[in-house]
Design a protein with these regions (language model features):
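Acidic (Asp/Glu)-rich catalytic clusters
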Residues: 1-5, 26-29, 78-79, 154-157
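Structural preference for beta-strand elements that scaffold enzyme active sites
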Residues: 3-9, 85-89, 112-114, 161-165, ...
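Aromatic-lined glycan-binding groove of carbohydrate-active enzymes
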Residues: 151-174, 207-209
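Active-site beta-loop-alpha junctions enriched in small/polar residues
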Residues: 9-15, 91-93, 118-120, 129-136, ...
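Histidine/acidic-residue-rich catalytic or RNA/ligand-binding cores of hydrolases
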Residues: 16-22, 99, 125, 173-180, ...
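Catalytic domains of cell-wall/extracellular-matrix polysaccharide-remodeling enzymes
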Residues: 63-130, 136, 147, 154-157
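Active-site gating loops and adjacent loop-to-helix segments of metal-dependent hydrolytic enzymes
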Residues: 17-58, 180
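C-terminal domain-boundary segment and adjacent tail
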Residues: 113, 178-223
Length: 223
């Protein structure tokens, strides 16, 4: 639907590249499959963090290849959806090079970069402290996302707008091959559709909104 803000996560850690693997050889393995975030973090020395960005001793993402793949993913989105994404968003593992590539592509296509838009709008993230990487399946099974989410809301500092990132979905054999974030997706979906969460939001006068509403009133694009 035109009024649903469907954006794109620039994915550099799972599945196959949109680009010809020969042109993004540093991003994929010998089978053309993206190198996982767990493998990147295991094989490269982390020296710090800056917000959502992970700082490595040497950035594992070649900038030019990352830029090519980022733009090709946006092109594929447009091809499939018939419109530009409502926003660009980093996925799983963000570094200086992945962020720089996203900034360039976002500017080229006149699409907001989610984290920049949220920062400029003074939006605060609802802290999610229960999803370590890697995330053992047994721990995922025992995680009560609904309870944790409501507690996170209760403990947040006052703000006009907050946002929460979750991965509502289902689990199948293909997913198990692609990510360590598996069973928790079912828990995320349970949380997002929970009557308990709905009742908490209503009771505390918390309204649901859209990233589109944070955009400039002068933006003529309808997402």
């Amino acid at each position: 639907k035109r009024n649903v803000a469907v954006g794109i996560d620039i994915n550099l850690v799972a599945g196959f590249s949109v680009s010809d693997p020969k042109n993004v050889s540093s991003l994929v393995n010998s089978c053309g499959h993206m190198v996982s975030s767990v493998e990147r973090m295991r094989e490269n020395k982390i020296i710090g963090r800056d917000g959502m960005l992970i700082q490595f001793e040497k950035d594992p993402y070649d900038f030019e290849q990352t830029l090519l793949e980022t733009e090709n993913q946006v092109k594929r989105f447009i091809e499939l959806m018939g419109r530009k994404p409502a926003y660009l968003h980093g996925h799983s593992l963000m570094t200086e090079n992945t962020n720089k590539a996203a900034q360039i592509v976002a500017k080229k296509y006149n699409v907001p970069l989610s984290f920049e838009l949220l920062k400029l709008s003074g939006v605060k993230i609802v802290p999610c402290t229960w999803t370590p990487k890697p995330f053992p399946i047994e721990d995922q099974k025992n995680t009560d996302v609904t309870h944790n989410f409501i507690n996170a809301l209760k403990n947040m500092d006052a703000c006009d707008v907050g946002y929460f990132i979750c991965h509502c979905g289902y689990v199948d054999a293909d997913l198990l091959k692609e990510t360590t974030y598996t069973l928790i997706r079912c828990k995320d979906l349970e949380c997002a559709t929970s009557n308990e969460v709905h009742d908490y939001l209503v009771k505390n006068n918390i309204e649901l909104t859209s990233i589109s509403k944070l955009m400039s009133k002068g933006n003529s694009n309808e997402y």
